[in-house]
A protein has these predicted regions:
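Short, structured segments at the rim of ligand-binding sites
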Residues: 1-409
Length: 409
């Protein structure tokens, strides 16, 4: 789907959709719990649907209605047959579920599309293979995992995706003995691990932090839970930046006491308004990079984004696509080994950009359009369905002028 956006400032109230990060975690924990859990305020998307279908494949019963889900925890796992899980393009689903399936002893075949087959899982092939798991894996998808995961010591580098740590934190409490996750270097993306630990606690699972990582007691029991998913600061970031560029949007459904790392967007915007620039370590907030680059493009001085090298293996090479987004519209962005250098120009203009299938590039482009003088065309705008299917509906309700010009995909 290709769209045309005519520049206009946004104004009004938007109810920020539920956190995708928290929804993934609550759905998985509910599926592992004894009894019935009810989770409200879910923002359904392709990624969330992938996790729901994954847990169904492992034996959970999940019933969805509008923004709610009723989950009956896994009672009988399909151990006598191979389960097939389609992760679509969701890296969270893939990396969260691999350890869970192996902890349950379910032989599982994983499928995926887009760039997901190229996203690495070598941490698991190395560490899980030491603990009873066999991988039939040739650096692509589909692939199969089999065996029964055993407790023990898991050594994980801190500069890899926190999704690997989260996956282990889900799985290890199910095992018969205690386990240790030993971080062999500084843990990046720590806020995402904090979200995991916070959600696990709601379901009765206790994770003990140690000097070197985490101690996980075995034979713990997930308890059923009823609650709502809080709003997503990573999605809110687009509207916060739109405000910084001159819009007047009131944001609802956000928890000011949230442990979400992307809440840092507020602090960075304040710094930019005070100083005219920012220098952002994005090791803990990688999802903010595209919209931060948009913010920096309209600053007064050069801004830098660093410690973001993992963005090269997202839905797109997000460092490249972010730079292309801004440079194609008159900006000045240079790619470094681990981030971006953004120099403001007075030459920002309309034009045409490609989404490269990346939902965050589409939304960053839509925010950028509010500060341009000419129309912006976004090719492949349907990518927003990955995380925020109603983004353009909300955008229009706020006064955005968006028209579909082609349904090509």
């Amino acid at each position: 789907m290709n769209i045309k956006i005519n520049p206009t400032k946004l104004k009004g109230y938007v109810n920020i959709p539920a956190s995708k990060s928290i929804a993934h975690r609550m759905l998985i924990c509910s599926a592992l719990a004894n009894g019935k859990s009810i989770i409200g305020n879910i923002n359904y998307s392709k990624d969330i649907d992938a996790t729901i279908n994954a847990m169904k494949a492992l034996g959970a019963e999940i019933f969805t209605d509008k923004n709610n889900a009723e989950i009956n925890g896994i009672v009988h796992t399909p151990k006598n047959k191979k389960s097939v899980i389609d992760c679509n393009e969701s890296g969270s689903t893939l990396r969260f579920i691999i350890p869970v399936a192996t902890a349950l002893g379910v032989k599982t075949e994983f499928h995926g599309r887009g760039r997901l087959p190229q996203r690495p899982i070598d941490i698991y092939t190395r560490e899980l293979s030491k603990h009873g798991i066999t991988f039939d894996y040739n650096n692509t998808m589909p692939f199969t995992v089999s065996g029964q995961l055993s407790n023990g010591i898991y050594e994980i580098e801190g500069n890899v995706s926190s999704q690997f740590i989260t996956g282990l934190l889900f799985a290890l409490p199910l095992l018969n003995g205690d386990s240790e996750i030993v971080m062999t270097s500084h843990l990046e993306s720590r806020p995402y691990v904090d979200i995991t630990i916070d959600v696990l606690k709601k379901f009765g699972i206790i994770i003990e932090e140690t000097k070197k990582g985490f101690h996980v007691k075995g034979s713990q029991t997930y308890k059923a839970y009823r609650g709502n998913v809080e709003g997503d600061f990573s999605q809110a970031s687009f509207f916060y930046v739109a405000n910084a560029l001159g819009s007047s949007i009131t944001l609802g459904n956000l928890n000011t006491n949230s442990v979400q790392g992307d809440k840092k967007i507020i602090e960075i915007i304040n710094q930019t308004e005070q100083n005219g620039f920012f220098n952002a370590d994005c090791s803990d907030i990688p999802d903010l990079v595209p919209v931060l680059a948009v913010l920096a493009s309209f600053g007064k001085k050069t801004s830098t984004i660093y410690n973001a090298e993992r963005l090269k293996i997202k839905e797109s090479n997000r460092l490249e696509t972010t730079a292309e987004l801004i440079n194609n519209l008159g900006g000045d962005v240079k790619i470094t080994d681990d981030g971006l250098i953004i120099r403001p120009t007075n030459n920002m203009h309309g034009g045409t950009i490609e989404s490269s299938g990346d939902h965050r590039i589409v939304m960053a482009g839509a925010v950028m359009a509010t500060a341009l003088k000419e129309e912006l065309i976004i090719n492949g705008a349907e990518a927003v369905t990955k995380s925020y299917p109603d983004f353009f509906e909300d955008y229009k309700k706020l006064g955005g002028n968006v028209n579909v010009i082609s349904m090509e995909q």
